[in-house]
């Protein structure tokens, strides 16, 4: 832990140094602008370059670092470069940044570098190698980088003096031209990057030490045949080719999951051990990787440094920005080899592939239930612990999942970001829009295996299946009546309480169910949006249309177990069964008379209350029953009631 703390501490110093340098950069830019306006002859301040703010490591240091320390190094380097680009510094992307973005190792062992690159040049004895290492080895302490400007090597072929650039923070002297190469050399370390074609020309500097001059300049000689990506080291190309080949030599002994990089395996193994060494000092949440902690901190600070150039939406993580940009481009580069389905994110493809393999490597320690995703295990564990870490600051309600919390917040804000392209109706949840779209497409993907009836929603199928099993788990404590759904029980209990929370804004009539209010309002509007494709008849309720369509198909899926009579509606079967049982569950509290149907009780109650809700629009006469109004209207139209 001491070594790790040292690296983290030193890296923090480096980030603080970057902060100071960025302040200096902004100040320098302002001063330069003022100098131009005032035509001051003062020498302008020098531009901050990537090398001024970078964090450098030797190859030896890189090999000795733990995976968490390497991840920290990657985060710091990438953020430093991003900040430079953000403030407008026109910098060419360094090779090390290119590698880090591809999640490749930025360095290899010095022995490999000497052995792989320019073997004709670097076959020198041990004494010369030590002298060369003295020239190119960097300062080992990250926090003690120094700027070396001492000129110690002279190339006699081109009559140029090269500085010993022993740190990534180099001299401000940009490039050094070599006439024989017709190329520019940034610093002496570039000599190590030449491939074949080098000419071994032994020169001597002012200290009498050997110095070799190269006659060719190839920085990235290794190219991937699959995607064309360039690499300066063959070892890096070999590692990269594993991505295309699908090679994953590092396998987890716990769950069998394989990785192309050893450090990724080490990080993964912490999932099984539960090790989370990096803890947030704000909320106490712990993480497996330091980079995850750094990203998490942005939740508390609100920092979102990555902005979309198309819509200017900002993100706390660069990966989220990259994924977001695919919304604008429509790019889905990750394709499933089994079914051809494409995804905009690689992680989604990986999770999708588990559907085909059936892989569920993550098991709950409490109940043994297995999951394909680690995040699913985390959420599942909260069902055992009762943990609800996401609390609404509006109403105090807490949630176990962040996604559910976000959806809940929309009930306060009224936000409905998911809009139907067919009718313009908006929804707060993506799943609600998906289900709604089936109204337009008539898609019913969920089919009952018992009777073949199909549904657009899975929950409707589950509810329907209880009809076949006879399961009614929700029982009324007042009358003992049982229901398939909890929502049906809640609505039923309003019969006992007399509660009618849904009132019509036109006539003031109240209802115990919202659906009844919606149906009632269509009386005022005359709206009948549901049309039969067979005969064109229109209905104000979708359910009525569905029942009507059974007339054309002759479908009668609900059969009486007593007499075998079949019905098109389950409600009709329920009423019919009462003719066998003699059940009359609806009793008048005025006179004690009982009825087998709720509608008959309602009509009967009007004899006590005198209510006559059905009024003739011709003469104003009112009736207690709709059927009576229909018969009465025939007197105005001259239509005669046919008796068969």
Curated annotation (Swiss-Prot):
Pfam families: KRAB (PF01352), zf-C2H2 (PF00096). It comes from the Eukaryota. Residues 48-119 form the KRAB domain. One of its GO terms (biological process) is negative regulation of DNA-templated transcription. InterPro entries: KRAB, KRAB_dom_sf, Znf_C2H2_sf, Znf_C2H2_type. The keyword Nucleus applies. GO terms for cellular component: nucleus. Its main location: nucleus. Keywords: Developmental protein, DNA-binding, Metal-binding, Nucleus, Repeat, Transcription, Transcription regulation, Zinc, Zinc-finger. GO terms for molecular function: DNA-binding transcription factor activity, RNA polymerase II-specific; RNA polymerase II cis-regulatory region sequence-specific DNA binding; transcription cis-regulatory region binding; zinc ion binding. A zinc finger (C2H2-type) spans 222-244, 250-272, 278-300, 306-328, 334-356, 362-384, 390-412, 418-440, 446-468, 474-496, 502-524, 530-552, 558-580, 586-608, 614-636. It is found in: Nucleus. The keyword Transmembrane does not apply. CDD domains: KRAB_A-box. Belongs to the krueppel C2H2-type zinc-finger protein family. Has transcriptional repression activity, partially through the recruitment of the corepressor TRIM28 but also has repression activity independently of this interaction. Essential during embryonic development, where it acts as a direct repressor of a placental-specific transcript of IGF2 in early development and regulates convergent extension movements required for axis elongation and tissue morphogenesis in all germ layers. Also important for normal morphogenesis of extraembryonic tissues including the yolk sac, extraembryonic mesoderm and placenta. Interacts with TRIM28. PANTHER family: GASTRULA ZINC FINGER PROTEIN XLCGF26.1-LIKE-RELATED, ZINC FINGER AND BTB DOMAIN-CONTAINING. This is Zinc finger protein 568. The lineage of its organism: Eukaryota, Metazoa, Chordata, Craniata, Vertebrata. The gene is ZNF568.
């Amino acid at each position: 832990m001491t070594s790790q703390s040292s690296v983290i501490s030193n890296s923090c110093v480096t980030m603080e140094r970057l902060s100071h340098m960025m302040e200096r950069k902004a100040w320098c830019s302002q001063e330069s602008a003022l100098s131009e306006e005032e035509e001051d002859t003062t020498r302008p301040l020098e531009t901050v370059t990537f090398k001024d703010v970078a964090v450098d490591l030797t190859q030896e240091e890189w090999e000795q670092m733990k995976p968490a320390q390497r991840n920290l190094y990657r985060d710091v380097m990438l953020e430093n470069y991003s900040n430079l680009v953000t403030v407008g510094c026109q910098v060419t992307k360094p090779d090390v940044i290119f590698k880090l973005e591809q999640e490749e190792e930025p360095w290899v062992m010095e022995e490999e570098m000497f052995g792989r690159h320019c073997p004709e040049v670097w076959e020198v004895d041990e004494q010369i190698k030590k002298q060369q290492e003295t020239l190119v080895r960097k300062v080992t302490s990250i926090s003690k980088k120094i700027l070396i400007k001492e000129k110690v090597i002279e190339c006699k072929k081109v009559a140029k003096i090269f500085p010993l650039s022993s740190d990534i923070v180099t001299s401000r002297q940009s490039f050094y031209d070599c006439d024989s190469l017709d190329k520019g050399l940034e610093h002496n370390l570039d000599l190590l990057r030449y491939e074949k074609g080098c000419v071994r020309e032994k020169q001597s500097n002012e200290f009498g030490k050997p110095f070799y001059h190269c006659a060719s300049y190839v920085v990235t000689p290794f190219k991937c045949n699959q995607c064309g990506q360039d690499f300066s080291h063959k070892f890096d190309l070999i590692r990269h080719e594993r991505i295309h080949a699908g090679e994953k030599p590092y396998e987890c002994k716990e769950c069998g999951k394989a990785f192309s990089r050893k450090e990724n395996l080490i990080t993964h193994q912490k999932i099984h051990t539960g090790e989370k060494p990096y803890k947030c000092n704000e909320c106490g949440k712990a993480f497996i990787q330091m980079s995850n902690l750094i990203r998490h901190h942005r939740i508390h600070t609100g920092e979102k440094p990555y902005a979309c150039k198309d819509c200017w939406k900002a993100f706390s993580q660069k990966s989220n920005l990259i994924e977001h940009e695919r919304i604008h481009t429509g790019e889905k580069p990750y394709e499933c080899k089994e079914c051809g389905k494409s995804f905009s994110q690689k992680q989604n493809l990986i999770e999708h592939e588990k559907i085909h393999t059936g892989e569920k490597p993550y098991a709950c320690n409490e109940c043994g239930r297995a999951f394909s995703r680690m995040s699913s295990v985390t959420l599942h564990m909260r069902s055992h612990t009762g943990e609800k870490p996401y609390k609404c600051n509006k109403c105090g309600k807490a949630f176990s999942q962040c996604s559910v919390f976000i959806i809940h917040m929309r009930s306060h804000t009224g936000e409905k970001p998911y809009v139907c392209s067919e009718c313009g109706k908006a929804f707060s949840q993506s799943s609600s829009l998906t289900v709604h779209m089936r109204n337009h497409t008539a898609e019913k993907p969920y089919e009952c295996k018992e009777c073949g009836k199909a549904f657009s929603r899975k929950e409707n199928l589950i509810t329907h299946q209880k009809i076949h099993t006879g399961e009614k788990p929700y029982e009324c404590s007042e009358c003992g009546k049982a229901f398939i759904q909890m929502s049906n029980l809640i609505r039923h209990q309003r019969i006992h309480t007399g509660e009618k929370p849904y009132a019509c804004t036109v006539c003031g009539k109240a209802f115990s169910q919202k659906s009844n209010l919606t149906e009632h309002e269509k009386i005022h509007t005359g709206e009948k949006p549901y049309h039969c494709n067979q005969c064109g008849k229109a209905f104000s309720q979708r359910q009525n249309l569905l029942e009507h369509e059974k007339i054309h198909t002759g479908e009668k899926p609900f059969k009486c177990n007593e007499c075998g009579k079949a019905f098109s509606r389950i409600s009709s079967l329920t009423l019919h069964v009462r003719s066998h049982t003699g059940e009359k569950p609806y009793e008048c509290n005025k006179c004690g008379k009982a009825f087998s149907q709720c509608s008959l009780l309602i009509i009967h109650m009007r004899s006590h209350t005198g209510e006559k809700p059905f009024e003739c629009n011709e003469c104003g006469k009112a009736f207690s029953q709709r059927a009576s109004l229909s018969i009465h209207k025939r007197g105005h139209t001259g239509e005669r009631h046919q008796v068969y």
